[in-house]
Amino acid sequence: MRSAAMFSAMLLPGAGRVQARPFSLNDPEDYAGRLCYNENPLGPSPLALQALRNEAALAHRYPNWLNTNVEEAIADHLDLNTDQVCVGAGATEIIQKVADAFIGPGDELITAFPSYVQMANEAIANGGTAVYVPCDENHIIDLQGILNAITENTKIISLVNPNNPLAKIIHKDDMAVFLDQIPEGIIVSVDEAYHEYVQTQDYESCVPYVDQGYPVVVIRTFSKVYGLAGARVGYALSSAELIQQIQDVQLYATVSRPSHAAALAGLTDSDHVTSTIAANLVNKVTLEVGFSFLGLEYIDSETNFIMVDVNTEAGPVAEGLADLGFQVRTGWDMPQHIRVSTGTADEMSDFLVALETVLETSGVQSDMVPTVPGINSVYPNPFNNKCQIRITVPTNEKVSLVLYDILGRKTYTLINKPLAPGVHDFIWEGK
């Protein structure tokens, strides 16, 4: 049981708080495509929206002080005990409180790089030291390197799985071997913010390790697949003992009544989660096809964002995209990469057009001509009134490009003649 007398707050120094921020300095209200925060473009579940509206009328009443209503629902959802769950104001608060509970002056935290840096910065702000282990050549977290970095001062190993910004997973077999080698007294924090998006069978959540006695703290959020980033609800899953230590440094009433209601409703709407995952898969393919067409290499993604090499300095490309209304992220000592979140179908198509424009302006030209003929892109996609269709012809040959309606009736012939090798654009006016 939580003791009110144990609640405390630890404030980071100003510089530490800025360094720990997960956000960019883009204008949050001025965009054509906000592709920098890995948000859910479908928005919240309709059930969550209704719950928000209903609960707004009770905004004059304090919330459940200790978030036990949401903790009970999460525990039931994941087949855990309520004392194995700690809810807070987004994963942001949870990460801070994990650091506050287990890291003090002289302690060490080990994490991967590139990765999500908040836990490391919270540790530094608490007087600890962060040790960074580079990811391997396949952009995967180097678990053996992390084991080799352990010292007598190590208190937390912080993993992000799937990783952000590299969007790669830790193989489930590698994770099992890794956890068996963790010395006593070290906690393994695993941030699973993007857990629901993963499709590969090589991945497994670390939640089952909670009941197996491993010293793991799994961190999750309602900000991503549930579409509640603005509601600020996150949670930790661990043993009752470790959860108690996290709760002992947590302030009460940090999550509002409407946010409680939205999280509870969203948790029950599996259809919305399924729709979100399906839309993400489609729109991620749109990005992958577009990047390939532009001759850009990207890192295969298991999440709702992709890291792509733009073949030039990323900063000016991001600025050029921002001028066209598209917000993306740069950094992580990857000077030629931008991180792009999946958005709506229209946002993906418009973004690819903008990216091509910026790259052409920057003097980055693609000389890649796919060896397989066919339609490379359609903007917008799906189209209705007007669109641009781009095709590739690898050799001299006759090309026939005909549009049919959904009943199979021919509506328009765009081209029916020989074309030279290369890339060709056609505009259909929708008439």
Language-model features: locations:
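N-terminal export signals
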Residues: 1-18
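PLP-dependent aminotransferase class I/II
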Residues: 45, 215-299
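Conserved PLP-binding catalytic core of the aspartate aminotransferase-like
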Residues: 135-137, 281, 290-324, 342
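PLP-dependent aminotransferase-like
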Residues: 101-159
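N-terminal "arm"/small-domain region of PLP-dependent enzymes with the aminotransferase-like
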Residues: 16-61
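Phosphate-binding glycine-rich loop
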Residues: 67-108, 122, 126
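C-terminal outer-membrane/trafficking sorting elements
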Residues: 367-379, 383-431
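Active-site pre-lysine segment of PLP-dependent enzymes
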Residues: 143-150, 165-188, 192-225
